[in-house]
Amino acid sequence: MSKTLNWGILGAGAIAKTFAKGVARTTGGKVIAIGSRSQGKADLFGDELGIARRYGSYEALLADAEVEAVYIATPHPEHAEWAIKTAEAKKHLLCEKPIGMNFGEAMAIVEAARDNDVFLMEAFMYRCHPQTQKLVELVKQKAIGDVRLIQATFGFRMPFDPKQRIWANELGGGGILDVGCYPVSMVRLIAGAATGRDFADPISVCGAGHLHPITRADEYAIASLQFAGGIVATVATSVGLEQENVVRIYGTEGYIFVPNPWLPGSDGLDTKILIYSNGQPEPREIAVETPNWLYAIEADTVAAHIDLRQAPSPAMSWDDTLGNMKTLDQWRQAIGLTYDAEKPENVPTVHRKPLAVQARGPKNNMKHGSIAGVTPPVSRLVMGVDNETFSPVVAVLWDDFFEHGGNCFDTAFVYDSGRCEKALGDWVRARKIRSQVVILSKGGHTPECFPGPISRQHRESLDRLQTDYADLYMLHRDNPAVPVGEFVDVLNEHVKSGTMKAIGVSNWSLPRVQAFNDWAKKNGKTGLAAISHQLSLARMIAPPWSGCLSANDPEMLGWLAQTQTPLMPWSSQGRGFFLPSTSAENHADAELVRCWHREDNFRRLERARELAKKKKVLPINIALAFVLHRPFPTFALIGPRTIHEIRSSLRALDVELTEAEMRWLNLED
């Protein structure tokens, strides 16, 4: 990179002009190109701001080899597509806030920056200003004691126009995404500073708001956020209502008032923070010197940290951005705001290309195996569908898994009262890939583990999944009081009708599994194609849920090896036990402690860490590879919440373990 950072700008609107004027006041940057949807707009922009290279398309600007960094100033719904394309063009990027329409798009943008080794920052310019740095310092120094309550507001009134960006549904209109993202980012920053971190994500988000009756954009909205450490916050935003755009931070010894939090020193003027201490009649004024125009400071922040690929706090790091977008999603969901483009049938791929499995290679290292009765070869990693249901988020996750060769999805009748099944069915239907995926459906969970409810649940699951059949159907629990033949009969009825292609059981004891197969064989019925029990390198010492069983005992493992019955193990990575934060001293996660903390497991963890260093992977990759290298077919269930976690899991497929390494990891040496 040259000494002067050469900028290109995508989008020729008002914010693009403001940024270009800011760059002109920097010492290390220069705008050399403008890209617009039309040549005419690019020419007008270039004439006004003295920019020689004017492109009538965004693609043309990205093809300019001398453009090193790109400021994305397009409308919200276009951020993801062009941020990803910018990263793929190997150019650093500063993306206008919000970085995407939702957490799903934000994940994809961050992963594109990571994949292509480029700088990325979300353009909250106030986070780069010295005033924000001073505010963080005051909180850390306990200038008002312990922080208890934070209030932040950003709102304005714009006359309603359904075609205007502020109000249009198709352009992501409304207060939360336009300016509500500012107070959310501020209270998360302050809550983090008060608890010794760069930022904090809320434990809970409750919200209320008013949606415009025509476009359903949020006209005004508020939210209450609860953080660790006893900190609560309120945020408010609007595009149809004037508000007092300030920040107040209340502590045990006073409060801080920030009169101009969002545009501090925008034209280079100094700014101030006021501290009201308990018992003092007048506030203490903290003057903050502004070294340059606000947007110049932002551009210089990018240039100064290009080599790090992220800027340090209080600027927006990647994780900070992801946490902010997650919180904005929660706020919007609390007030019932889902944009038309986010409805299941409308969600596009984040890169705006047709969904397709990548060719075998670095972007697709998936391995597949066979399960009797299931037609497509089954991916050795199975996507757990048991948590997130917001359409634009699950679409990004599942698209990424599918593009990397993953085709098996595990869900159940009881997960989130059926919403998980519905979300999966919506995605498969919208993407038109039913014949290309394997759906593992489960029913018969306690207390309805009887033959009668199983048929009813199966029919309801098919309706939610919007399909005529389950590729593999499993009983979620066992009921030993029911003769095994009754379960064999009811499942075989559905096999005969074609609504179950193959059948299995989850969390059954070995004697009951054997009895099922024996009864089926004796009576000419279909037996078990696979089973699903817990299995991981770390031994489960207590089940996370009632009625769960592990396959990690000599008899079950021996039977699996002898019969070559496929195992689809859940909690295959020990539910986070192999993450860097795990230690015998860390009791923050009570469930992790209850289910996994034991001396022998910590020895396995240390060995996984040692072998991971040798093989240049992560300990969690070693743990998953251990499950995939068993002497019987395994199809490991994983539960990634982010694209990055998907990519991390995929690395395990390339890890080779010798028999000696397997024994050593399991303390059998």
Q: Positions of the model-derived regions?
A:
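N-terminal Rossmann-like dinucleotide-binding module
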Residues: 1-49
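Beta/alpha (TIM)-barrel catalytic core signal, keyed to glycine-rich beta->alpha loops juxtaposed to Asp/Glu
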Residues: 223, 392, 478, 482-669
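NAD(P)-dinucleotide binding in Rossmann-like oxidoreductases
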Residues: 213-218, 228-300, 306, 310-319
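Rossmann-like dinucleotide-binding domain that binds NAD(P)(H)
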Residues: 162-232, 236-243, 319, 323
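Beta-loop-alpha module in the N-terminal Rossmann-like domain of NAD(P)-dependent dehydrogenases
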Residues: 49-112
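N-terminal binding-site loop/beta-alpha segment at the start of enzyme catalytic domains
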Residues: 346-437, 496
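A contiguous active-site-proximal alpha/beta segment in oxidoreductase catalytic domains
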Residues: 100-160
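C-terminal helix-rich "cap/oligomerization" subdomain common to oxidoreductases
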Residues: 1, 69-71, 304-365
